[in-house]
Amino acid sequence: MDINEIVQYLPHRYPFLLVDRVLELEENKRILALKNVTMNEPFFPGHFPHHPVMPGVLIVEAMAQAAAVLSFKSMGVKPDQNSVVYFAGIDAVRFKRPVVPGDQLLMEVEITQSKRNIYKYKGVARVNGEIATEAELMCALKTLS
């Protein structure tokens, strides 16, 4: 899935769109998504000027965005002005390796539980096969009206 299709499933846009490509997607199971981390990211000038590191919260957000794509695709719907997937919870977060400019962040997110419009996931973000971040995520699909 390229960026043109991804933006059909995510409301995020620059500078907060953190999924560049979906490599694999098994509906109701898992997604494998990619974020190319470049020196042009808007957060690097401040985090940190002489040693740029991608903020851990944005790595977790990138996994949550991948989870949202998986959820919408699995439900067979696209977000619109009346629906949104909210990041509802996070547990067991571990940051194991810094993510720096030039890295390709490979995010694998699997659905571990779903009930009505609430989904739980296990996410692992890797760089060159090495775990950078792992977390348990929870998202909720909400209808806005």
UniProtKB/Swiss-Prot annotation:
Keywords, ordered alphabetically: Cytoplasm, Lipid A biosynthesis, Lipid biosynthesis, Lipid metabolism, Lyase
Cellular component annotations (GO), alphabetically ordered: cytoplasm; membrane
Main localization (coarse): cytoplasm
E.C. number(s) listed in UniProt: 4.2.1.59
List of catalytic residues: H47
Catalytic activity: a (3R)-hydroxyacyl-[ACP] = a (2E)-enoyl-[ACP] + H2O
Parts forming coiled coils: none
Cleaved signal peptide residues: none
One of the GO BP terms on file: fatty acid biosynthetic process
Role of this protein: Involved in unsaturated fatty acids biosynthesis. Catalyzes the dehydration of short chain beta-hydroxyacyl-ACPs and long chain saturated and unsaturated beta-hydroxyacyl-ACPs.
Family indicated by similarity: Belongs to the thioester dehydratase family. FabZ subfamily.
Identification of the protein by name: 3-hydroxyacyl-[acyl-carrier-protein] dehydratase FabZ
Species of origin: Azoarcus sp. (strain BH72)
